[in-house]
């Protein structure tokens, strides 16, 4: 059975401010990792991280922008693995909604199937939760947020 990561968080900030943290490479690097992202449908880009041999991960996430609706939705592929041509394929979906003078952000990451994916699923689930809270702290150093998984 496939596992899905799902987190929702409220930011007391305008949608445009949250959107920037999802689409501006320099801001993305502050809460996620170095990248060559461009907010253009079809753009192929990479996130680079420390290799994790225990997870059979070479340190590179190979991505492609699949859908983009400015200030509303961003979807990209998120493929990773040992770098030998065999990649684990997944998809990251961000949805932003204006709510109560702020932004409701929904993150859904799909594509974790098979028992061999359980360790990476757990690591990614925890990682995404921490990362969306990093955005909150970058936007509002003095504020806390609520999240639901």
What are these regions (language model features)?
Residues 6, 13, 26-60, 148-149:
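Short beta-edge strand/loop motif at the mouth of beta-sheet-based domains
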Residues 21-22, 68:
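Conserved catalytic core of Hanks-type protein kinase domains
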């Amino acid at each position: 059975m496939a596992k899905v990561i799902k987190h929702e968080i409220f930011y007391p900030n305008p949608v445009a401010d949250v959107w920037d943290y999802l689409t501006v490479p320099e801001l993305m690097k502050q809460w996620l990792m170095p990248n060559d992202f461009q907010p253009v449908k079809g753009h192929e880009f990479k996130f680079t991280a420390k290799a994790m041999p225990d997870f059979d991960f070479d340190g590179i996430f190979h991505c492609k922008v699949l859908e983009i609706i400015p200030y509303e939705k961003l979807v990209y592929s998120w493929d990773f693995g040992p770098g030998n041509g065999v990649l684990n394929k997944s998809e990251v979906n961000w949805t932003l909604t204006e709510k109560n003078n702020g932004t409701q952000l929904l993150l859904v990451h799909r594509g974790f199937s098979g028992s061999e994916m359980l360790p990476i699923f757990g690591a990614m689930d925890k990682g995404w939760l921490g990362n969306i809270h990093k955005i909150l702290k970058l936007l509002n150093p003095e504020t806390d947020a609520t999240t639901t998984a």
